[in-house]
Amino acid sequence: MYKTLYTVLVSFLTISVATGLTAAEYKGPNLSGQTVSIAGPWLTGDEENFDKVNAYFEKATGAKVDYAGSDSFEQQIVIDIKAGSPPNLAAFPQPGLAANMAAIGGLVPLGNDMENWVKNNYAAGPSWVDLGTYPDKNGNDQFYGFF
């Protein structure tokens, strides 16, 4: 369920922002009653802007978004992952930290469909995929996100 939820959320946020998709036009799964936890570094004005995107997502999908912004995100995400209580999504401000978390099995790959979507829909798609691809705990390259 979580991999599907990650993919739905990432896909929706990316596509809706890129294309101007309205909440009424959303055709993905109904996520009513589910909560999506997101951790990131955004505070004050940046958090307010992100909250607007989250409100849009909530309206379209029926899910509730629980965003926790922190000026110590880099430390907190490591603690949360190692404790086994990570958020559903994390907005990493630096790819190196995301790569470190992937290497210990702390991230869930987005899969080939999302990787191909980014390659085909971003002007420098392959570069974005490269930036979000890291070895997993077994040393296999996986696509975890885009920046």
Pin down the residues of each PLM region:
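Alpha-to-beta junction loops
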Residues: 81-92, 106-108
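Short, low-complexity disordered leader/linker segments with a strong preference
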Residues: 1-36, 59
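Short helix-initiation/N-cap motifs at beta->coil->alpha
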Residues: 69-76
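Short, well-ordered beta-strand elements
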Residues: 32-43, 63-68, 89, 144
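Hinge/lid segment of periplasmic solute-binding proteins
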Residues: 24-30, 97-147
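Short, polar/charged alpha-helical segment
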Residues: 26, 43-64
